[in-house]
Amino acid sequence: EEIVDGKSERGSHPVERFPLRQWMLRITSYADRLINELDDLNWSESIKDMQRNWIGRSTGAEVDFFVGWAPPTNPIDENAGGIEAGGQSPPYENWKASRAQAGFPEKPGDDVLRVYTTRPDTLFGATYMVIAPEHSFVEKLTTPEQKEAVDTYVRQSSLKSDLDRTDLAKDKSGVFTGSYAINPINGEKIPVWIADYVLISYGTGAIMAVPAHDERDWEFAVKYDIPIVTVVSPADAEDGTRRREDAKKTGSDEVLSDLVSSREPTEVFSGKGVAVNSGKFDGTPTDEFKAKITDELEAAGLGSEAVNFKLRDWLFSRQRYWGEPFPIWHELDADGNRTGLMRVDSADELPVILPEMEKFKPTGTPEPMLSTAPESWLYKTAEDGTKLKRETNTMPQWAGSCWYYLRFADPKNSDCFLDPEVEKSWLPVDLYVGGAEHAVLHLLYARFWHKVLFDRGHVSTCEPFQKLVNQGMILGEADPETGKAEKMSKSRGNVINPDDVVDAYGADSLRLYEMFM
């Protein structure tokens, strides 16, 4: 699951992204609870902060940028007669008027790129847009002249991991789609680019780029010679409020002149301040401007206040053989194609047992290797005559590791996974001893799993682990020159056999020693 230079960490095999229809668990529905209920736990603040930051709750606004000009030609092609003098065309004006009447829709249409931003106050400084290489609008927005360059770039991006793509130290890259969008706050035409520093998994997979106030956008704009416009001055917010009030009294914009820096800044400013180059909002402090611009966007049907999370829904399927099969069947039509309807195995058909197979290697296609399982396991006919095909994805190891502590309390129960009286007697876990490296994976997933079981009435508490203690981490030999050392791990081949210590001092002594390092 680690990718280095487009190859797997183990074996150095080429890794490529494929679009797959997979199973997801909607952990985002529990995001607020996963944050708020941390306060009641006897865990270190550092671990709590790691989970809070991983979930990454933020407030901001969703904003729609119009791109619905005349696909498949350039959405705003000045040479095709699709744009009037002044940079706008009837379709945009009609769209804007329609939005003013209907309001901001819950889901964006095919004529807009929707973005999420924590800084709607910087909207006047958006000089270009970026969509992720996987965005559904890539084909729609790519002009014939740019198709070859876009196809090449998208292919290259598919070989990179998300970590590589978002590494701040790496050079930014991108490709112009040939198309433009309209900035809804000032009506200006701005180009739409594709760049892999934008991830499809965060927000909407599209951003409004404000290079004067974002480091990544700045680097990209400088590289591709895109305009950079300052819209936030680092002037004192209270000073800005006073000057704005003075300007109102005098009726002159000159009072604000010393707040406005050059439209072409020499460095990035990402903090709070007062608005500049923002029309009637000049001099407005950042927090006040955020609220005002959001209200104005909502009134015009162009945007809305929104909450977003860095946390994504949990990908819960794998294409390998070894894993718990999903107890799900897909209905097939007369031609053997899926209809979209599904059925589940009955209780007396559980658990689903993996078929015996001689070959376990991947198929070389996006299809799970269980798609080559014997037909007797793969297909069946329902009592009503409907032909069914078994789901061939398998569950990840998390399917077992998220709730093992519950089964420990009642391991021999063949009637249910955990007797209610036993659960009330033994749980929640009083003390969990585990490494800090589990903070945003196992510990977060187990909390989510437990909350789902709590909501379903299977456990009596909403949290699984009351107290958490992190033991030390064993390191391998350090480099004598740099002092750097990797953790001791089987995958790194730097382990020491503990048998000698166990023979001399006993296993419990070794365990306690490790716990209190």
Identify the residue ranges that each predicted region occupies.
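Conserved active-site neighborhood of enzyme catalytic/cofactor-binding cores
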Residues: K7-S8, S179, Y202-S233, S317-M517
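Structured, non-catalytic alpha/beta "coupling" segments that mediate domain-domain communication
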Residues: P120-K140, Y321-E331, D335, L341
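Catalytic alpha/beta core of large soluble enzyme barrels
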Residues: H135-P234, E267
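Amphipathic alpha-helical
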Residues: M24-S58, A132-F176, L350-L378
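Conserved oxyanion/phosphate-binding beta-strand-loop segments in alpha/beta enzyme cores
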Residues: D40-W43, Y153-W193, D384-E421
